[in-house]
Amino acid sequence: MKKDILYNLALFFSFIILLGTSNGQLIPRNSDKPEYRDFTSANGKTIKALLIDKTEDTLTLKLPNGKSATLSCEKLSIEDQEYVRKWDKEKELFLTQCKTLTIRELLEIRGYESFKFTIKGNHIFVEGELNGNKSQFMIDTGAGSTVLHIEAAKEKGCKVGPLDQVIFGIGGEAPAALTEVPEIRLGQAFIKDQVLLSADMFKDIPNARKEYDAILGAEFMSKMRAVISYKEGRIFFRPDLIDNDDEIEVPDVPKYRFFKTKDRKTFKGKIAKKNATSIELAIEGQNKNLTLPLGRLTDEDQKYATDWSPQREIFLRQCRGLTVQDILELRKYQSFEYKRLGNHIFVDGKLNKKDTRFMIDTGAGSSVLDVNWAKDTGCEVGPMDQVVYGIGGQAPAAITQVPSLTMGNAKFENRQLLSVDLFKRLGRGLKAYGAIFGADFMRETDAVITYREQKVFLQTD
């Protein structure tokens, strides 16, 4: 087989030259409480009220005495017409009634399947299956493609070809083999019949623990519409949307559902209220509610009832138009649109007040600077007497004092990082980016990465 040089980023490397910029913008938020305000009519009269609904031509106001009134938008002052135009009912409901819901709850309500991940040395690991065999995977947004550890690939039933391919990592190049992979699975999320690369992931790494069987790269994350949440310690997938370009953000939800009991009775209704031991069902077509002990329900319906809350119900049925981006920005996250080329994701920021492009890399336990860019931006770079390890072996590195690194409102000051020659093979004139934004800073800012919306979110306050 002809030897090909495959420029896969394995943990740290990209050869893409990017143009253009992307800047994060904070979205103005409403008050977290119902906003009673003075509305002024076109003839100058004022009334204190709460905006609760609107159509294209009318608005509905709730008055302090509890009554409501509907009037034409044209009867308001120009300023108040503009307020009504910008007002968003779904966002208002979310802010006032759904803010106690966690990111996990909000995404699972939206149909995402979630997996708890563990963090070791700032790396993210999840459990899954490789050809039906229990396996450990490292989540690496910096890896353009999924790569298997060659020993695990052989042990778990993959067909491994000759080592006639080459991949590149922080330590240089390493031989790799084209590998036929019947299946990689995490819960309901899976890929089948793929040809991927295998390599000795731990070669020349001292005391390597061989803690994982494969790196799940950006192409897998993109296919599964992944959301990675450091605060929740979870990764979320939408396996139902694989290969579906005409995707629906939120599946339709019927007004009523079937509740089944352990004595094989079925009731069609919806939860009206609940307490610690029972639920009260509003039965379809009946005026009287039915009370059922939780212990009488099937295990599946017990879980549904236990998870149910009025806030979840409001969000599911009345906030359907909100995107994941809307939800996170309303939760005080700052968003950054990233550039995604070659499966890698990049965001713009500043290193010592100089514009810098960062690669977002969950596989990098610590943020790393390109040594030449670090010098160009005024960082204090020490001697190259440190060593970093990765695919391809080891590479020299320098302890570097960083006065400031900023991304939007996220600011990291007086930090000590490592600098490495990230582009040694390309020459100094060919730089794809100036630094790697690693898991250390992402944990510090409770980062969320969304592949569907191509956004990175940081919580800066």
Role assignments for model-derived ranges:
Residues 9-20:
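Bacterial N-terminal signal peptides
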Residues 23-36:
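Cleaved targeting-peptide boundary
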Residues 26, 74-461:
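Pepsin/retropepsin-fold aspartyl endopeptidases
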Residues 34-42, 257-262:
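Short aromatic-glycine motifs in intrinsically disordered, low-complexity regions
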Residues 57-68, 279-289:
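Basic/aromatic-rich interaction segments and small domains that mediate binding to polyanionic partners
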